[in-house]
Regions:
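Surface-exposed amphipathic alpha-helical tracts and adjacent flexible/coil segments at the periphery
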Residues: 1-24, 28-39, 53-54, 60-88, ...
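Aromatic- and glycine-enriched glycan-recognition loops and surfaces
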Residues: 42-51
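Basic, amphipathic alpha-helical recognition segments used for DNA target recognition
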Residues: 105
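Residues at the C-termini of beta-strands that transition into short coil/loop
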Residues: 119
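Beta/alpha (TIM)-barrel catalytic core signal, keyed to glycine-rich beta->alpha loops juxtaposed to Asp/Glu
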Residues: 122
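Conserved nucleotide-cofactor-binding alpha/beta core module
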Residues: 126-127
């Protein structure tokens, strides 16, 4: 396990939502690309968008996971390597996989890539976890039906990093095992094309138009302490097809209660409901096998009265140290967290007329413009009789910020 209580894992159906959930407090984001994802009808990321997403997230210390969570035909395997290679080189943090053959192939193709098994793999016990570990799996996403007591036992017996769904839609059947949509309409959930027939009304014993297969949405925000005690590391929010306000709002509330460790207020719980729900919430799977109170019965539609404001883009705070001494190369060292970068210019010359003013130099360095950064503090060591042109100071700032940006983003697999 890593040195933090939880990873808050958020969905993103497009680049705008990805940026929004990161600004709202997500530790990691999962997305779908142009192939092999379980949301074939979503507006999935293009290659260009996904590469931008990886850079945006990594600059902020956030991880990106790519869904490869459908069953893949033999004829499609030849496309898998080329599809993933560009993201692997960019530093994609992990793939989320359903097909055991794909797990084996990715581990062979990209041995340093983390592999997370999808909930579509229906892992419900320690034996399944042990089986998967031999193929390089680094995290297992628990089936939604697994209780907290079972998760605790699985974690204690295997030591595997566990991820559990904490919020969002529930399937009536085990994810990855349901053929209802395939049989009824020829659209396979295992190929990302589920038609959701469980959300339709049915006649049972003469009773018409009852939604007997439509489950309420999950909400586990009141069980965070119990999830922690069960050994769950990653808390997954469902919703790659949800809107910006929903995704950002849910992330904001979970972020607040993960960090504060306070009991969830009734007012906030009601506000989370307003963001979106199906006839209320349930967390019964955490504690019981099932129950009739999990079913919506009267209406299956997702109701949202989202009124949460979209998060504003925040600048990333950095520190700077400016050194300008006569006869020595001028330098600007910038630091964010434990990442530093030093940029230099030609040796500083003596002033022929008016020497460089210290405040003016600091003000010049402070002009970060439309970059992602802003200085929280600049320490300056400037000689008494030196001169540096504004253009050189601008270049020093640009080079330092660009270098820090490249270093922060990194290239994890090359």
């Amino acid at each position: 396990m890593r040195n933090k209580d939880f990873e808050l894992l958020a969905p993103a159906g497009n680049l705008e939502i990805l940026k929004g959930v990161i600004e709202s407090g997500a530790d990691a984001v999962y997305v779908g690309g142009s192939m092999f994802g379980a949301r074939a009808y979503a507006n999935n990321f293009t290659e260009e968008e996904l590469l931008e997403a990886i850079d945006f997230a990594h600059l902020r210390g956030v991880k990106v996971y790519l869904t490869v969570n459908t069953l893949i035909k033999n004829s499609e395997f030849s496309k898998l390597y080329d599809y993933l290679l560009v993201y692997y080189k960019r530093g994609l943090d992990a793939v989320i996989v359903q097909d055991i053959g794909v797990v084996k192939a990715i581990h062979e193709y990209f041995p340093s890539m983390e592999i997370h098994t999808s909930t579509q793999m229906t892992v419900t016990g320690a034996d399944g976890v042990r089986f998967l570990s031999q193929f390089g799996v680094t995290r297992v996403v628990m089936a939604r039906e697994v209780s907290l007591a079972e998760m605790k036992r699985i974690h204690e017996e295997t030591g595997m990093e566990l991820e559990a769904f904490v919020h969002g839609a529930l399937c009536y059947s085990y994810s990855g095992q349901c053929l209802f949509s395939s049989i009824l309409g020829g659209r396979s959930g295992n190929r990302g094309r589920c038609a959701q027939p469980c959300r339709l009304p049915y006649t049972v014993e003469g009773k018409k138009d009852e939604y007997i297969l439509s489950l309420k949405d999950m909400c586990g925000i009141k069980a965070l302490d119990k999830l922690h005690d069960a050994g769950v590391y990653s808390l997954k929010i469902e919703g790659r097809m949800k809107q910006l306000e929903y995704a950002c709002g849910v992330v904001k509330y979970y972020r607040n209660y993960i960090d504060s460790k306070k009991p969830v207020s009734d007012a906030d719980y009601d506000r989370i409901k307003e963001l979106g729900n199906r006839c209320g919430f349930t967390d019964r799977y955490y504690f019981d096998h099932n129950g009739s109170d999990m079913v919506t019965y009267v209406k299956p539609n997702f109701v949202s009265n989202a009124a949460e404001p979209s998060p504003e883009k925040r600048k990333l705070s950095i520190e700077g140290e400016l050194v300008l001494r006569e006869g020595e190369p001028g330098s600007l060292t910038v630091k964010r967290g434990d990442v530093t970068y030093k940029a230099s210019i030609e040796p500083v010359s003596a002033a022929l007329k008016a020497p460089l003013d210290k405040k003016a130099a600091i003000d010049r360095i402070n002009k970060t413009g439309d970059t992602d950064f802003e200085f929280s503090h600049i320490k300056a060591q400037i000689g008494e009789n030196v001169f540096v042109p504004n253009g050189a100071l601008n270049k020093l700032r640009r080079d330092a910020i660009s270098g820090l940006c490249d270093k922060q983003i990194g290239r994890a697999h090359v």
